[in-house]
Regions:
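Metal-cofactor-binding active-site regions of metalloenzymes
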Residues: 1-17, 34-35, 228
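Alpha-helix-loop-beta-strand connector modules within alpha/beta enzyme cores
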Residues: 1-3, 49-59
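Residue-level detector of anion-binding/catalytic polar loops
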Residues: 4, 28, 55-56, 108, ...
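Flexible, glycine/charged-enriched surface loops at secondary-structure junctions
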Residues: 4-6, 58-60, 200-202, 231-233
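Divalent metal-coordination and catalytic microenvironments
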Residues: 5, 11, 30, 60, ...
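Alpha-helical segments flanking ligand/cofactor-binding loops in enzyme cores
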Residues: 20, 44-48, 160, 235
Length: 248
């Protein structure tokens, strides 16, 4: 079955050659992740290589703030364009202030679907999820504290509003425990409905808000990753994203 899929290569390297080899092999972008190094050297190198090859860097920032604080990350990025993952209340990244990355003119932002819309059991679910995905033991004080620090309910609630204000540009599934690939569009539309009830209608009808939220899962990611000429919207000349048929 044909799929509109691009692959991201591991972006954590102090030298350009490994990154360039992966791009030459067909990778469409680079991914920096805290689990294998979201330090200053790796981040700067990935951005240098990405600029040279006109691809995107996706960033999962340093959640333990061991190598970089959020201010340090902004300093290393130095105005270059980047896609920051997990602009949300869990999932990883600078704790507790990863939301600081939202609103920067050069930073494209996304959040993963398990955190929105924020509900009664959202925070409780994520503590168990973090422990499972990162192989933590709840009976070890250090592991338990790490899981608690990664789940920030107030930030999760703020995430919904930041989406409605347009400060978070994309909705994603991520992978493994943090993401649910089959729920991205459904949760995106649920969030639009919740925000309409919470913040009021955007006009005489809901069309504007619906289109803005639809863009978070379609054209915005396509633009962010340089593939909007092929996918992301229904236009002449693009690959088909939808098929209409009349059941017999």
């Amino acid at each position: 079955v044909p799929l509109n899929t691009v692959m991201l290569a591991r972006g954590s390297s102090s030298r350009p050659e490994p990154l360039e080899r992966m791009l030459a092999a067909g990778a469409a972008g680079l991914k920096i992740h805290e689990d294998v190094g979201a330090n200053a050297t790796a981040l700067d190198m990935a951005l240098r290589v990405a600029d040279a090859h006109d691809v995107q860097v996706c960033l999962h920032t340093d959640g333990l703030n061991e190598g970089l604080l959020v201010e340090d990350t902004l300093r290393v990025i130095d105005g270059r364009t980047i896609h920051a993952f997990h602009i949300e209340g869990t999932g990883g990244g600078h704790a507790p202030d990863v939301m600081r990355l939202a609103g920067e003119p050069n930073i494209l932002t996304s959040s993963t679907n398990p955190t929105f819309p924020f509900g009664l059991n959202t925070a409780a679910e994520h503590a168990a999820m973090v422990e499972l995905v990162h192989v933590l033991r709840a009976d070890l004080p250090g592991d338990a504290q790490l899981a608690r620090d990664r789940v920030r309910p107030a930030t999760m609630a703020a995430e919904d509003v930041l989406h409605d204000l347009g400060l978070i540009h994309m909705t994603t599934s991520d992978s493994q425990g943090m993401g649910r690939i089959g729920e991205t569009l459904r949760r995106t539309m649920q969030l639009a409905s919740v925000m309409r009830d919470a913040r009021g209608a955007a006009g005489d009808d809901d069309n504007d808000r619906v289109l803005r939220y639809l863009a978070k899962a379609t054209i915005n990611p396509a633009i962010a990753h340089g593939i909007a000429h092929d996918v992301g919207s229904l236009e002449v000349g693009k690959l088909a994203d939808i098929v209409l048929w009349e059941p017999g």
